[in-house]
Each structure stands twice: as structure tokens, then as C-alpha cells.
């Protein structure tokens, strides 16, 4: 048996099983994310939320998914059918593909590559193409204009996200996500995590993630009460479901990045409790709760305000933070606190 797993066939089978496990975990989480999002929103508004299908409404998401799947797919006249169907599939698969390099515990990662952060950014950057393709292939000017706005929004906040992560890379000297988590290991538990030295960037990263995922209060592309569905206006049935699934998976990816980069991933918050994958899952669901609460309580921004914040506030702050972290790490300022994280230190 050991010889089989060491063979090319065993390696291929191992990769296939790991890929299926990642897909099963993310898609299973997706079901409860939609349910939790609706329940939290209902609780803030003093409603009950989903409560009919299944116990406590737990099967409501399955019922909604089945409803979308069995509906007729209405294709607009003059639409490019190939691109029309490729766009939602591409958006969901790229978000799902990024989880290949997300570690849930020590050794629990499908591809432990040294450029894991670059891999995630490459996958998330390509999601813009799915949005533009969906708007263009619909052969309608309104979805196309919405797709251009969405692309501008996503690209604008990717710059800030990248600069924030550069600060973490300077602190650890690595782009490997497992190495970043291990750099946060220490005798003081959560006080060793990067949320403390990088506290301002935690806030900036979270807000930028909201804009990157088109989540309220930055859901200007598909504001339900104003723009119907933005670039998804001409989509229905399963293609629309794939677009929505892609957005939730991208949000879950941001929850994973927040947990890994700033909150120790699978590390325990207190030294006397064992580390484990459950800490990673708990932290991811905490950040999902924060995403859901922001959706429920924060009013929507105007588009010009969104772009102004991204380019005139977040970009200078994140760039200045990179310079500050580089200086602190290079010259071992503040009692050598940054020295142990310095590149080459």
C-alpha cells in the first residue's frame, strides 16, 4: 500500500481525494453561511428569519438552491451563450480554487507552496474577468455598465489588500501561509498574533475585504433595493446561483485570510489549550459573523465615496504602513520587538 501511494497513480488519487475534501468543506460551509447570514439579518431586524423548511429552518438553503436549479434558464436575445455560461462558472471555480493553498492545521493543506499568498491573489484577481464577461455576454447595457463598476471597485481595493499583506510578509520573511502562522506562535498565546502589532491594518483589511467581495455597505454593483442585480440582472436559474455561490465563497476566503494573517490560524489563543483545526474554523466563522453584522447595521455608501475611500484613504495608509514596518524591522526599533520578525533577522 505504501508503494502505491508513493507512485504517480497514488499521488494523483491523493490529490483528487484532497480536492474533493476541500470542495466538500467549502460547499458545506456555504450552505450554513447563507442560512446564518439570513438569520443574523433577521435577528437584527427583530424577525425570525428562515424557520419553515426543516428544524429551525436549517433546510431552507437546500430548498432555495433546488428552486433555482429547476427554474428555466432564460438567455437574452443576442447573448454570447458560451461566455454567458462560462462567466458564473469561472467566478465560482476561481474562488474555490484559492482554497487549495489555505492551511487548516499544520500539514492540513492541499498545496503548501512558498508563494501561497501570490497564488490567492492571482486567483482572486481573475475573478474580475468573470464579472466583466457576465456583464458583456448578457448583451444589455445595464449589466455591462454594472460589470465595469464592479471591476473598478474590485481592482481598487485589491491594491490596498496587497499592500497590507506586504507588511505581514516583511514581518515574517515568507509568503507561505503555514510559515506566517508558525511565526505567530509564542508563549503568550493571542498576544503573539499579528493583530496586535498590525492592529490598524486589521481594520483596513476587513473593510477592503468587504469592498472586494461586493458586500454591504459596498454592494453598490448589485444593490437589491436600487439596481436589481447589477451585472447579474440577465441571469436566472443555475447561472445566477453560481454567481451568488462565488460571492459567498470569496467572502469565506477573506475570513480564512484574516484568521491566518492576523489571528494565528489554527493556534490556540491561550498556551494551555491545544492547537487544532477547530480554532481555524472558529476564527473563520467569527469573521463571517462580522461580515453579516456589517451587512445588517451599516448603511450603503455612494459610489464616489467608495472610490474616494479606496484611493485617497486606504491606499496612502496601507503604503505608509508598509514603509513603517520596513523601517521598524530593518533597524530593530521599539525594543527589538520587530527584530525577531525582520527579514534575515
Curated annotation (Swiss-Prot):
Annotated localization:
Cell inner membrane
The EC code for this enzyme is: 7.1.1.-
Say if the entry is tagged with keyword Glycosyltransferase. no
- Which Pfam families does the UniProt entry name for this protein? NADHdh (PF00146)
Q: Which PANTHER family match?
A: NADH DEHYDROGENASE SUBUNIT 1, NADH-UBIQUINONE OXIDOREDUCTASE CHAIN 1
Q: What does the UniProt function comment say about this protein?
A: NDH-1 shuttles electrons from NADH, via FMN and iron-sulfur (Fe-S) centers, to quinones in the respiratory chain. The immediate electron acceptor for the enzyme in this species is believed to be ubiquinone. Couples the redox reaction to proton translocation (for every two electrons transferred, four hydrogen ions are translocated across the cytoplasmic membrane), and thus conserves the redox energy in a proton gradient. This subunit may bind ubiquinone.
In Swiss-Prot or TrEMBL terms, this protein is called NADH-quinone oxidoreductase subunit H
Q: Which organism is it from?
A: Paracoccus denitrificans (strain Pd 1222)
Amino acid at each position: 500500500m505504501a508503494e502505491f501511494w508513493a507512485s504517480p497513480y497514488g499521488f494523483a488519487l491523493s490529490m483528487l481525494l484532497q480536492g474533493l475534501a476541500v470542495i466538500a468543506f467549502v460547499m458545506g460551509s456555504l450552505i450554513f453561511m447563507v442560512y446564518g447570514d439570513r438569520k443574523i439579518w433577521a435577528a437584527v431586524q427583530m424577525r425570525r428569519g428562515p424557520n419553515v423548511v426543516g428544524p429551525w429552518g436549517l433546510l431552507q438553503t437546500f430548498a432555495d438552491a433546488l428552486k433555482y436549479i429547476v427554474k428555466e434558464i432564460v438567455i437574452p436575445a443576442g447573448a454570447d451563450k458560451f461566455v454567458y455560461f462560462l462567466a458564473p462558472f469561472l467566478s465560482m471555480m476561481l474562488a474555490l480554487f484559492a482554497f487549495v493553498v489555505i492551511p487548516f492545521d499544520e500539514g492540513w493543506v492541499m498545496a503548501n507552496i512558498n508563494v501561497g499568498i501570490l497564488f490567492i491573489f492571482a486567483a482572486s484577481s481573475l475573478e474580475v474577468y468573470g464579472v466583466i464577461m457576465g456583464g458583456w455576454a448578457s448583451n444589455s447595457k445595464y449589466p455591462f455598465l454594472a460589470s465595469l463598476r464592479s471591476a473598478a471597485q474590485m481592482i481598487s481595493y485589491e491594491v490596498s489588500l496587497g499592500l497590507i499583506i506586504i507588511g505581514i510578509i516583511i514581518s515574517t520573511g515568507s509568503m507561505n501561509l503555514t510559515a506566517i502562522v508558525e511565526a505567530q506562535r509564542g508563549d503568550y498565546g493571542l498576544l503573539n498574533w499579528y493583530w496586535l502589532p498590525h492592529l490598524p491594518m486589521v481594520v483596513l483589511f476587513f473593510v477592503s475585504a468587504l469592498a472586494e467581495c461586493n458586500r454591504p455597505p459596498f454592494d453598490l454593483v448589485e444593490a437589491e433595493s436600487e439596481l436589481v442585480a447589477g451585472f447579474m440582472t440577465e441571469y436566472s436559474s443555475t447561472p445566477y446561483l453560481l454567481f451568488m455561490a462565488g460571492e459567498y465563497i470569496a467572502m469565506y476566503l477573506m475570513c480564512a485570510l484574516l484568521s491566518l494573517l492576523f489571528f494565528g490560524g489554527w493556534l490556540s489563543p491561550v498556551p494551555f489549550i491545544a492547537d487544532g483545526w477547530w480554532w481555524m474554523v472558529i476564527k473563520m466563522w467569527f469573521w463571517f459573523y462580522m461580515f453579516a453584522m456589517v451587512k445588517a447595521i451599516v448603511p450603503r455608501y455612494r459610489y464616489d465615496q467608495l472610490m474616494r475611500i479606496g484611493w485617497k484613504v486606504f491606499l496612502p495608509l496601507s503604503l505608509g504602513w508598509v514603509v513603517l514596518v520596513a523601517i521598524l524591522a530593518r533597524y530593530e526599533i521599539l525594543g527589538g520587538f520587530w527584530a525577531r520578525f525582520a527579514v534575515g533577522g
